[in-house]
Amino acid sequence: MKTDAFALRHIGPRETDLQHMLQTIGVDSIEQLVYETLPDDIRLKAPLNLDPAMTEYEFANHIQELGKKNKVFKSYIGLGYHPTIVPAPIQRNIFENPGWYTAYTPYQAEIAQGRLEAILNFQTTVIELTGMEIANASLLDEGTAAAEAMALLFDVRTRDQKKNNTHKFFVSEEILPQTLSVLQTRSTPIGIELVVGNHETFDFSTEFFGAILQYPGKYGQVNDYGAFVAKAKENEIKVAFAADILSLAALTSPGEMGAAVVVGTTQRFGVPMGYGGPHAAYFATKDEYKRSMPGRIIGVSVDANGNRALRMALGTREQHIKREKATSNICTAQVLLAVMAGMYAVYHGPKGLKYIANKVHASAVTTAEALNKLGVFQTNTAFFDTILVKADAQKVKAIAEKNEVNFFYPDAESVSISLNETTSVSDINQIIAIFAEALGKEAVTVSELTTASQLPASLERTSSFLTHDVFNNHHSESQLMRYIKKLERKDLSLNHSMISLGSCTMKLNAASEMLPLSMPNWNSIHPFAPVEQAEGYITMLKKLEQQLNVITGFAGTTLQPNSGAQGEYAGLMAIRAYHLSRNEGHRNVCLIPSSAHGTNPASAAMAGMKIIVTKTTPEGNIDVEDLREKAIEHKDDLSCLMVTYPSTHGVFESSIIEITKLIHENGGLVYMDGANMNAQVGLTNPATIGADVCHLNLHKTFAIPHGGGGPGVGPICVNEKLVPFLPTNPILKVGGEQAITAISSAPYGSALVCLISYGYITMMGAEGLKSATEHAILNANYMKSRFEGHYPILYTGECGRAAHEMILDCRAFKENGIEVGDIAKRLMDYGFHAPTVSFPVAGTLMIEPTESEDLAELDRFCDALISIRKEIEAATADDKNNVLKNAPHTLAMLTSDSWDFPYSREKAAYPLEYIADNKFWPSVRRVDDAYGDRNLVCSCAPIEAYMEN
């Protein structure tokens, strides 16, 4: 046996476990199990045509060699991406630490207090630097955040504006080009008309509901927008700012100028450029708009003892509850990167951020003054970090690239130079020497940075920020390291136990896949660097696209969408473009089964589609007759069907080919949601079932870690007819011949983390990928067999099998006074994160073990739920003081002098023998969600200030 095969490390069950597992299920082989699970007509007839699998050692050498093809030049391109210094303790203790990167979105607050606090720090940083009242837990990138700001301002129009269909949105010509492209994509299907122009000549017409300004502008100009905002307010036009987060340590905050929304990226707070991402965008607004905000919001509440506890707030705004009426389709954002950016603010504190901002500004002023002496004149009347000079762009570019330096060239006579945190005096002298050579003059040299500010006094920041203790007490490395560890210890991640969240695929994120992310050759490249400097990246990304084409059976892939929700949106926009190209723009009806994930209707609404919900049968399958009826009824305006396969109920529906054929016969296309692709890879694929487009979650099926709520990557794979419509980028041309405008800010989205999926596929190979799928199905059916007789299993296939996940029905336990949430909280006492609660059916648990979990871990989890089942039996409806209702139990409870519970401390904390060996303690008791929403606090202000009398 090849013991160096990566698949052996990735897949949990050992060869010696198989017989026992198969026997428990009641089959003779994995082949028989797969045969009984997958419909015969959708099985692949040949293995995937992929390269032979590499070992981990071979991949490490391969990725290092490939990385050498990337040329890391000094980058002064700017445009929202800047070289930054990643503090080593943050890189080592967060970015490279599975305790942080393998966690899931903090749905179970009691075992997520660490990252909830870290995100609260991020929100506080954003609120105080922007001068706003509330901020969310991050968004995907600056372009997406700007589009969400536009959507929010459209949503909060006045009654008269809605009545009069006021639909124009002003965009300053200073906006970043990639942001403009994303705004164009988002505005068209929802009926918003963009008007791009000079803010100084804007007429404040009543036809406008909102405006967005860049602060500072794309080439560095800093404007005082106070008068603009005041005039806009008089005309009921609300103004959003896209602001550079570092500049706000030196400049007057947008909040002080009257902004309604402020967005931007926190990339330059210690997160590497990574050829475009991932980075955490931010979104801040006024308290009055909180219920229209997109994304997650972390708020302060109390636990069952009245102690301060954190949790996700205002969840009813989100797509999994509001569906097509949600504020946004975004679920996964960029939590890991938000944690890094927030910790950067903690480490540097207000004085440190001010120092860095002033140093960056001084570098820009020093460069401008030196170039001025050469006769190269700067055109910005005021600037923070970026200067725009008049020069022969072609000549400067040739000399700069010879010296391994990148500037940005807006036109033939202009050069934009964006200075950053890493810029030194010797870097400035190199810049001066490049221009001197271009002019044929002798270079002047500088020996130190100037102390003179170039900012107008009216725009210099005078207000304080980050005054809370957390930003002023962790400035030595020991302090920071211990603070990070303190938070990490409060969180349950994959490095402690399995996380069986259904529809989330919490599989192994192997160290060998993650290592390249820390290599400078991969993480230090600007997304708009000339392509010849990114040969390693282009090779890797194109290869990954080819691998995904083979796996899905499709003809083309774009990696641009940087979350599953963005992938859904991109797929629907490609379908929309296809119909428009055939003069069938009237095709706008989207059929969605009632069992679909909430992102589906939310994405369809964003794509301007009319949503028709189709029924499901009592067995949980799509009701084919109801679908037929609705497809025929809407055949003249049918755009598409959105279908998840295997279904959200964890079943391979045998009628899938009939379903897709039905849609095609009535003029529509089929969009397959790839959330459950982990049950397909190597066994079947979207093309075989008749889909036209699918999105994949690289953070599920293809091993990118969830990061506590992001990053994610949601590429779309399409058939021949949709290839021409894959999205482009305004600076680096990518996508199809009739490409839609940008979905995300960067041409390849979150390119850096694509290395993980590339590594996963490359090391697994065709055989390993197929084996992973088979073992995912094996693990799910083994658990299902163990649960039978203890919990009703809600849906199964025709042979009684689950796909890769199953639903346990907990609704009957209400007779014993037990809710499904009680089971979720009690699992924490057993050392486990709960499965998915009340989705897709209220009162149920959806369990997905993945292929990475070994037999011993599966058994521990099964033992825990079976033990809880016995505890449920012992409970009575009128008993509110039992071990389930009081769960989870904290160490403080167990060690308290008083114990007023009718069960032992041992039963509370150590209900099964295995727990004592590796006990995980929740850090708070059950969190009061309702209290937190009534008393919303989303920053680090002391809780006492917000308590109701």
From Swiss-Prot:
GO terms for molecular function: glycine binding; glycine dehydrogenase (decarboxylating) activity; pyridoxal phosphate binding. Keywords: Oxidoreductase, Pyridoxal phosphate. The modification N6-(pyridoxal phosphate)lysine is found at residue 700. Pfam families: GcvP2_C, GDC-P. GO terms for cellular component: cytosol; glycine cleavage complex. Its EC number is 1.4.4.2. It catalyses: N(6)-[(R)-lipoyl]-L-lysyl-[glycine-cleavage complex H protein] + glycine + H(+) = N(6)-[(R)-S(8)-aminomethyldihydrolipoyl]-L-lysyl-[glycine-cleavage complex H protein] + CO2. Signal peptide: none annotated. Belongs to the GcvP family. The glycine cleavage system catalyzes the degradation of glycine. The P protein binds the alpha-amino group of glycine through its pyridoxal phosphate cofactor; CO(2) is released and the remaining methylamine moiety is then transferred to the lipoamide cofactor of the H protein. PANTHER family: GLYCINE DEHYDROGENASE (DECARBOXYLATING), MITOCHONDRIAL, GLYCINE DEHYDROGENASE, DECARBOXYLATING. The glycine cleavage system is composed of four proteins: P, T, L and H. NCBIfam families: gcvP, PRK04366.1. This is Glycine dehydrogenase (decarboxylating). It comes from Flavobacterium johnsoniae (strain ATCC 17061 / DSM 2064 / JCM 8514 / BCRC 14874 / CCUG 350202 / NBRC 14942 / NCIMB 11054 / UW101). The gene is gcvP.
